Amino acid sequence: DYILIMAKGIFVVEVKGGRISRGKDGLWRYRDKYNVVHTRSEGPFDQAQSGKYALKNALIKEFGDQEMKNVSIGWGCIFPDTVNIPQSEEVSKETIIDAKDCDTPEKLLKAINKAMDYWFNKKYYYKEIDSEKIRKMHMGLRPVFEITPSISVRVNEIFNQLVCLTDRQYHI
């Protein structure tokens, strides 16, 4: 859902709101605000983790393996509507941010920093990212672009302008 680039590294965040469950069949079920249930085989932790690896591969392709080897890339899940997420061996508690961590922006930032510290401290060779490298990563991930309306949209706009002009001319 989100990518945060900070001095201590990059943090890939999966946000899951509403009611969440994993059944005996291993499938995850998400009930949205409209009470519609969505079923997925990949849970939020797997989504965040696979997002991390996809991002890491994209950054290596963009900046090179040597440039990225000392950069900490972590992942976590935010559950803004839920407290006391069940713990499992496959997920570290530092990667989970729940509703009590989201009460205020300060608490959320503290929880994100705690998660980033967890990932940053996993390897002795991780180095902080300087502001220029952060800027380059930001531009590499979010390049400047321009989107223009399709021809059919422009034709409809022009047609509506002509109708408007014709109506005004008729009244003159």
Q: For each of these PLM feature ranges, what is it?
A:
Residues 1-3:
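N-terminal low-complexity, intrinsically disordered segments
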